[in-house]
């Protein structure tokens, strides 16, 4: 009887040891793994006019970072915050996301904000396709013209000077109020 009890204890301890080793391995813990969308979204992105969007995608669906406009009178970087679908569909659809930049920093206050809403599409040529709304503070009488609408495509490849020039000549607009005011 004593040998059976000792054998049972030994088997139990071995099982506990194997279970503890398996759960100590972070690659086995789904919470420790970074989602493909999270890993793909995090980084530095550029739009067709050369503006820079630096973002970190959190496991909880948060987007944080900075936006630096390449056009208009914007100076330095502006804080951005947003959200993305941290559990996106697995059917090949894009990952829904959106973020906002209030055009106020230590250098300027344009009394406006831009929101981008779109989809992250991963792969070899990852991109973020967005539509944006730029709303500026106005008088009640001018409220009808307070919001501009446009679109941006962001990639992780910085555009060349020639492609930026071509986009400008094609009339591509942007979500920067400091540029819109001058137009």
UniProtKB/Swiss-Prot annotation:
Its main location: secreted. It is found in: Secreted. GO terms for cellular component: extracellular region. GO terms for molecular function: biotin binding. InterPro entries: Avidin, Avidin-like_CS, Avidin-like_sf, Avidin/str, Avidin/Streptavidin-rel. It comes from the Bacteria. Residues 1-24 form the signal peptide. Gene3D superfamilies: Avidin-like (2.40.128.30). A motif (Cell attachment site) lies at residues 83-85. Residues 37-159 form the Avidin-like domain. Biotin binds at residues 67, 78, 116, 132, 144. Belongs to the avidin/streptavidin family. Homotetramer. This is Streptavidin. It comes from Streptomyces avidinii. The lineage of its organism: Bacteria, Bacillati, Actinomycetota, Actinomycetes, Kitasatosporales.
């Amino acid at each position: 009887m004593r040998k059976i009890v000792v054998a049972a204890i030994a088997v139990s301890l071995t099982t506990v040891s194997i279970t503890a080793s398996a759960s100590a391995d972070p690659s086995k813990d789904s919470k420790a793994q970074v989602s493909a969308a999270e890993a793909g979204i995090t980084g530095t992105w550029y739009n067709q006019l050369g503006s820079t969007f630096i973002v970190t995608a959190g496991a909880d669906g948060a987007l944080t970072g900075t936006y630096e406009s390449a056009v208009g009178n914007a100076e330095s970087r502006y804080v951005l915050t947003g959200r993305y679908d941290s559990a996106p569909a697995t059917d090949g659809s894009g990952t829904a996301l959106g973020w906002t930049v209030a055009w106020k920093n230590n250098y300027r206050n344009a009394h406006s904000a831009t929101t981008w809403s779109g989809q992250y599409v991963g792969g070899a040529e990852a991109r973020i396709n967005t539509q944006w709304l730029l709303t500026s503070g106005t008088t009640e009488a001018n409220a009808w013209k307070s919001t501009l609408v446009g679109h941006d495509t962001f990639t992780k490849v910085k555009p060349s000077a020639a492609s930026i020039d071509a986009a400008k000549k094609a009339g591509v607009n942007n979500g920067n109020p400091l540029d819109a005011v001058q137009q």
